[in-house]
Amino acid sequence: MLLKTSEQKPRRAALPTVPLAADSGLVLLPLTEEIVASVVPTAADDPPVDGFYELATGVAEWARRQSMDGDVAYLHSEFFGGGGFHAAMAWRDGAVAWGPLFTATSDGEAEDHYATVTDLRDMAVNVMLRWWGVQRADQIDEFTAAGLSRCRWTQEWAALIAPEPPTAV
């Protein structure tokens, strides 16, 4: 889950996030089983949102509510050997504001509702990040410019979450 923060709309609740590219205002909330269970205890039993492999309906509802404090996006990216797929959707002010969009690099990479694109810059996550104002500048794409290429797996991202400072006794 990607969160876009701003000084105008600070988040009400502290979440276990990882800061992304400097000055981007973007943080990543790795959706590990533990984190999902802490924010949506029923998510393990929830069906996925239509079209998505792993976005549980309860997590989508939680994202919708979180978007009252700033933009929220769900990103799913799977690539191996230059081929793969993206799925993305974003919420703003309590409603779906962008997507969902499902893209793949070739036919057969994902289910039939995924559009095949020939330019990686047209993959769903890149398109959504452009909608948020991320510019690729000299990077290969917006995914890399945002700092999302730093880790490949959710657990790698979770290991980057800064531990909470100890509380005074």
Label the predicted regions.
Residues 15-102, 107-115:
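Short, intrinsically disordered low-complexity segments
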Residues 4-6, 30-36, 135, 154:
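Alpha-helix initiation/capping motif
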Residues 1-23, 159-160, 167-169:
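Short, extreme N-terminal segment that most often corresponds to the first beta-strand
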Residues 98-169:
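Long, compositionally biased intrinsically disordered terminal regions
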